A protein has these predicted regions:
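Short, conserved structural micro-motifs that define repeat-unit consensus positions
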Residues: 2-11, 62-63, 142-146
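Short active-site oxyanion
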Residues: 21-25, 58-60, 164-165
Length: 208
């Protein structure tokens, strides 16, 4: 597990409940902070290269700040490791292509940790849509509101160049679910207002 901040800690507590998974190491640049959360559960590292060198690892779970996802994912895939990565996958299309290329060339699995599609109510909607029990789904309206995140390390989430802002950090949940139900859209239109005075906005329309 790389990064044990907000989402990293959530993942850490989930791994403790999975009987057929063994968490072999945690890596975070804040060693004292990590030790406080991990305790004696597993070794703690501050350097990902040292962790990958010393431990026998099947899967690396990347829960670092978003702007670090691409570099770490490519490194782990190139070392022959499967990767689970917190959303967003990357902050640019170019970096996403690099990650996909590394996954393809390595033959290893890469998954973005989109959680919404696995939530019971969302999974049920997809199931009845796939089965056609309620007829054809012709429109899907999804809305999401959130306060500005103020809990991140060094406030990186408030920097849209590091987090991707409301588009890649928040709206991405709904975009992923829509695509899981309806597939890739034929075209997309969107309007966006950058973060200003604690307010940001995006409206996306996916056409099928």
């Amino acid at each position: 597990l790389v990064g044990i901040g907000g989402m990293g800690n959530v993942h850490f507590n989930c791994y403790k409940k999975i009987k057929n998974a063994e968490l072999v190491a945690v890596c975070d640049v804040r060693k004292d902070f990590a030790l406080e959360r991990v305790g004696s559960a597993c070794p703690v590292y501050t350097d990902i290269d040292e962790m990958l060198k010393n431990e026998e690892i099947d899967v690396v779970d990347i829960c670092t700040p978003s702007y670090l996802h691409a570099e770490m994912a490519v490194e782990c895939l190139n070392k022959g490791l499967n990767v689970l990565c917190e959303k967003p996958m990357t902050l640019t299309c170019a970096d996403a292509e690099k990650v996909l290329a590394a996954a393809e060339s390595s033959g290893k699995k890469f998954m973005v940790a989109h959680v919404v599609r696995f939530m019971p109510q969302y999974a049920f909607l997809k199931k009845v849509t796939d089965e056609g029990k309620l007829g054809k789904l012709i429109s899907l309206d999804m809305r999401r509101l959130s306060s500005v995140p103020r809990w991140s390390w060094e406030n990186w989430m408030q920097d849209e160049q590091k987090s991707g802002g409301v588009c890649l950090d928040l709206s991405v949940h709904d975009i992923d679910f829509v695509q899981s139900v309806l597939g890739m859209p034929e075209r997309v239109s969107a309007s966006y207002r950058p973060l200003k005075n604690d307010s940001s906005f995006i409206k996306s329309t996916l056409y099928y």
